[in-house]
């Protein structure tokens, strides 16, 4: 039986509360009054200065350094407002700040009414008796976050709380762990340092006689009793349709209207679903499982990690969020992890995830650091967590809370060179913050979801070890993060056979059309100051080229701009191939237990999106353009996948299915193609095999040497293996896939394919013709927003037709004029 429990907590103002919005035009001034201008609230200082022409685009070239002074200054916001007499006569008046970034002192009519020190929480200040008949003056003095963090760090004299500063390559600010602010705003290895200041969410005056509703929340309970309490009400529904993740069923959302006599009513969406994080013994394994069960069904999570969409949150639009989430869904993703170094996303993000069936792994905003545990810090964190859980727990898309990103691992593997004698002190602080406070609040506020203290973690095994495991990366338990940039990513045996891969990935550069918006032509060289400046990951550019060079000949055009464009292309090829190999390994490991490891039930590659135009691990560029990786994700996250590997000289092909009940009868079709001909050298077809529902099944195994001998006229270097799954009747049921038998850099017979297009026809179809087989065929239309139905593909026929879906009005002529076509053999 399904019920929903409604909780009323004394906000949603309506009939019983008079609201005066204070959003709109304010005045903004810096500390010495040398800068004074009109500002929009919600907003931030950087955006205001740019809109008023005081500065240019902060993302342009080296402006992140040139505009550092903005974050080092203090700023004052001022507004005037009047209150109607009939409103002023009510009993109570409260000023509500939904979000201040970050440290501020607020005064009304010259009287200090409160202070803020946390950008992640709402502040309410009672101003009854302070309102005037005439104009009221409201001022918000915002202190430099950099200065505040430094002062708090230096005041913490008993022991250090590392890290002090980010690596020099990040060009960032220090002591971000001492301020409750987006940790990445002081810099990260994929983004700039812009420690923003401002009133980043709405401001309003609420006037009322008695009380007001602060929030409505709902939770799903399974109970046969109907109980009515003073503060909540259980409502029984005889029959409801469940909410399912994308690819597993419909996302049923119900309109729920709540009428409160005091204040009127409100209508919002509710849904019904259950979630469990299953950690239980596995036969033939010394560890525990780690997987999500939604509505009683095990679900393999397929997705990525989400970082802030923009350094300046006031510039994040609904369209930007929608494009990214739709892109995730189009890539067959059913999950995203909101990473703990950014922000709790805005309401529209979670509402869209509810609609699209995208499950959310929600971190709390602590990342890659240790944190202080003074009383005032703990107090503001407790309020932050309480507010965020109450705000988000009604969303069916949110399926798990996680206390932090990598902080258990930071202590366990000694990131910060803490002495053995001092370690217990830091473990105590860790337990105090994440277990005794954050976990305690979450369990009180929301009993319907699992809570993990950290990621990666060994889950219940970490708990047994006092919350900090000896090895939080142990693949027998919990989730893992894994990065290795110098090992050959084509060697799938090097990847951990983990229960759940919540972070992994490789860098690439975004397209030239994306970079050109923030650079000049002299920057378009991998050895330029711009290329070095934009790379915030130590040795990142070298790692990309070294990894690419293992399997590809690097571009050698004598035209510097063309060489730059080609090098960008080769980094995207490398990234797509590396992540594909790793992801397919995880997907076909879901049914395996080998040496106690396996039963992988989730892959969230790092990362979905970008915060600016620069090199990163993303599959979608800043602005929404898909990298090659994202196109490939649509295939390696397909509901039914054929995945091939070479193991001990054998070609193994697995059939992987996300289905819960249907066993698919499939044939595996394998073709060997020569690089010098469109005709298959030979073809093989397996007998009909059943793919296990919700599992992985070996559907084809053959000695590669025997296969080459059997086919004749093929060597590892001269041929490629293409394969797919079909029904017994021959219908395609998995994406086409392929496996190289040697590195493409050693390919024999691979020629320049001379790809041409016949122009764009109605509905934006592009027909391609080539003279020889081509690999990694890439179509780019520069700045025209949209995406192709396939891209970065293997072209084994003389003709191929691709569809472009535009995100804005365009013409065939515009697309044709901007179309660039590249294949691997074209870059050397």
Each language-model region and where it sits:
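Active-site neighborhood of glycoside hydrolase catalytic domains
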Residues: 355, 371-464, 623
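Intrinsically disordered, low-complexity Pro/Gly/Ser/Thr-rich segments with frequent PxxP/GP/PP motifs
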Residues: 227-241, 668-716, 784-811
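Active-site-adjacent substrate/metal-binding segments within catalytic domains
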Residues: 52-97, 101-117, 179, 205-206, ...
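Aromatic-lined substrate-binding rim segments of carbohydrate-active enzymes
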Residues: 125, 132, 335-381, 439, ...
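Accessory beta-strand-rich segments of carbohydrate-active enzymes
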Residues: 12-13, 17-20, 24-33, 45-53, ...
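Terminal connector regions
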Residues: 242, 260-266, 701-753, 805-828
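Extended acidic/polar, glycine-enriched regions
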Residues: 129-137, 224-284
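Substrate-binding clefts and catalytic carboxylate motifs of secreted carbohydrate-active enzymes
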Residues: 18-21, 27-35, 40, 184, ...
